[in-house]
Amino acid sequence: FGWPYFIGENRGYPYYDYATNTLHEENNPAKPLNKSVNNTGLTELPPAQPAFISYPYGVSDKFPEVGTGSRCAVGGPVYHQDDFKNAKRAFPAYYEGKWLAADLSRGWIMSISMDKNGNYKSMERFLPSYQAIEPIDIKFGPDGDLYVLEYGSNWFRKSDNAKLVRIEYNSGNRTPVVKAKASASGGALPFKVQLSSAGTIDYDG
């Protein structure tokens, strides 16, 4: 809310005087001033508001879920079930009122919970197994599915892995991952074979 005078939780930038090439004191978030010679509006600005969620390149003590590395937050939608009453399929009530936000550089999508006044409560990884490739936009479609636009790995040129991803919600248990093995695929009678389902996974028991 205070950019370019402040960043994150109202950490101020010093004012730079280009005429004298000198740095001056940082702006006061309670009473920021626009001292630019190009300013055609107010000099005394409203109090700056700290960022709703902010995090550094390193580990965040306040938001450890976001990880580390380069950062580029991408805002997404707040989910409301009433918007999808006639949708073929819609996300469950669990996501009601939650904000989905991403980070282009880190490739995650977070599900962020807020209280009735819009204050931050908690966040959790949305689809932890899904690593988006430079997500630049997230929206719900009228069909109730979530669409994620991935920029891809290459900047300012063609990316073969750029794509539009559709994420649909399917109720009920997840499909098991089945692995079947046979000790032999054929032979003379009497044919004996040993069958195994080792490695089969049912995520929901």
Segments from the language model and where they lie:
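Acidic, Ser/Thr
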Residues: S196-D204
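Proline-enriched interdomain boundary motifs that mark the N-terminal boundary
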Residues: N173-A182
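Beta-propeller domain segments
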Residues: F1-E124, I133, D143-R174
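Short, solvent-exposed loop/linker segments at the N-terminal edge
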Residues: A182-V193
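Hydrophobic core residues within well-ordered beta-strands of beta-rich domains
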Residues: C72, V193-Q194
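Asp-box/BNR beta-propeller loop motif
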Residues: F52, D204-G205
